[in-house]
Amino acid sequence: MAKGLFDCTGKVTLVTGGNGGIGLGFAMGCARMGGDIAIWARNAEKNAAAKAQLLEAGAGRVETYVVDVSTEQAIIDGYGQIQQDFGRLDCVFANSGASPRFNSVFDMPTEHWHEFQAVALHGAFYTLREGARLMKERAEAGERGGSLVACGSLSLFQGLP
């Protein structure tokens, strides 16, 4: 039964970085609307805690996966697991991010810059692209395609120190 504006019953939502922060908040919203949720994040313990919270909030089904979105193949494999476990995908919330460990670009090693971009930029791109491919296949088969949501940083609009 819908609890608010949306009814997510029977809908599968993938939330990257969904075991805490904004990602968990988004997943909780879907859970309260009765949706099924897949979480990709790197910390298995935090994934398990998030799963318990989401089920308590009313999610239909929750599966968590240890997926590092900085690698394209991990994302492709992760979608294969979601397809195997749920059989469909209705929404992708690309939320994984990495916090800069340095206050100044002058102090940031190039290696850290590449690690940061592998998650924040490349990971979001791979996640959205591969999710869109699955949704396109469904749309071509006559079903509704789905929704893609990219979560960005306020630093897009105002530089951070």
Predicted regions and their residues:
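Catalytic Tyr-X3-Lys loop
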Residues: F106-Y126, V149
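Rossmann-fold scaffold of SDR-type NAD(P)-dependent oxidoreductases
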Residues: T16, L89-G97, A120, A150
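Conserved glycine-rich Rossmann-like NAD(P)H-binding loop of the short-chain dehydrogenase/reductase
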Residues: M33-A49
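Conserved mid-core segment of classical short-chain dehydrogenase/reductases
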Residues: I76, S99-H114, E137-E143
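Catalytic loop of short-chain dehydrogenase/reductase
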Residues: E140-P161
